[in-house]
């Protein structure tokens, strides 16, 4: 009888709960591509979306899905990480307000509260966007809302959120009957980048 080599086990920490951005990983799992490569891949949703790169650097996982701008911050902070691939080739991040809010332009954020989920790069993206409208981060109050981007807007805990994905939160908000208005970083002073 033929002997089968043991499969290599790979733990992948996701950047967020499973969503359409992870489609290549889900498809590979469900169609047996990982099996064909002799891999047992475990996808793990994070308790905190800022932790996957730190956990991978601490050897608590083999791979972490993260954001390109966040990787640059982590490398600058000397985390032992290496980029191995791309899942999403263009920005998904956006600054979102409720469509019926008084905020019509980014300049209207002066004195307002902005929620975020991953510190370090979302505030940098927001800072660059604010600068194109004559504001700085000192002109807004930042609040970590973790995974509750849309709910924090609905509950009026924040006036805007940075880090909402245009292909997820905006659709979720429409489904919930609370449509959003998005400002895209690449249209407000941030160079285009690969999201995941």
Please report, for each region that a protein language model flagged, where it lies by residue.
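Short coil/turn segments
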Residues: 15-19, 89, 98-102, 117-122, ...
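N-terminal hydrophobic or amphipathic helices and topogenic motifs
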Residues: 1-31, 35-37
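Pocket-lining segment of extracytoplasmic ligand-binding domains
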Residues: 69-70, 148-196
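Short beta-strand-to-loop elements that line the ligand-binding cleft
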Residues: 40-48, 65, 137-148, 182-185
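Short, well-ordered beta-strand elements
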Residues: 6-18, 39-45, 111-115, 141-143
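Pocket-flanking alpha-helical
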Residues: 21-29, 44-82, 92-104, 122-129, ...
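A structural signal for short loop-to-beta-strand junctions that line the ligand-binding cleft
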Residues: 10-14, 79-88, 108, 112-115, ...
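Short helix-loop capping/hinge motifs at secondary-structure junctions, enriched
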Residues: 35, 99-108, 135-137
């Amino acid at each position: 009888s033929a002997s089968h080599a043991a499969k290599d086990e790979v733990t992948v920490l996701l950047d967020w709960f499973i969503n359409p951005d992870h489609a290549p990983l889900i498809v590979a799992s469900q169609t047996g591509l990982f099996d064909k490569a002799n891999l047992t891949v475990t996808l793990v949703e994070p308790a905190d979306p800022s932790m996957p790169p730190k956990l991978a650097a601490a050897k608590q996982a083999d791979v972490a899905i993260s954001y390109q701008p966040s990787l640059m911050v982590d490398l600058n902070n000397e985390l032992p990480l290496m980029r191995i691939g791309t899942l999403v080739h263009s920005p998904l991040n956006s600054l979102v307000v409720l469509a019926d809010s008084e905020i019509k332009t980014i300049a209207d954020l002066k004195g307002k509260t902005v929620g975020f989920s991953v510190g370090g790069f979302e505030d940098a993206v927001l800072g660059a966007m604010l600068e194109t409208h004559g504001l700085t981060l000192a002109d807004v109050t930042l609040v970590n809302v973790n995974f509750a981007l849309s709910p924090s807007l609905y509950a009026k805990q924040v006036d805007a959120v940075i880090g909402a994905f245009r292909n997820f939160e905006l659709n979720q908000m429409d489904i919930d009957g609370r449509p959003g208005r998005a400002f895209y970083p690449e249209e407000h002073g941030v160079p285009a980048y690969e999201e995941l």
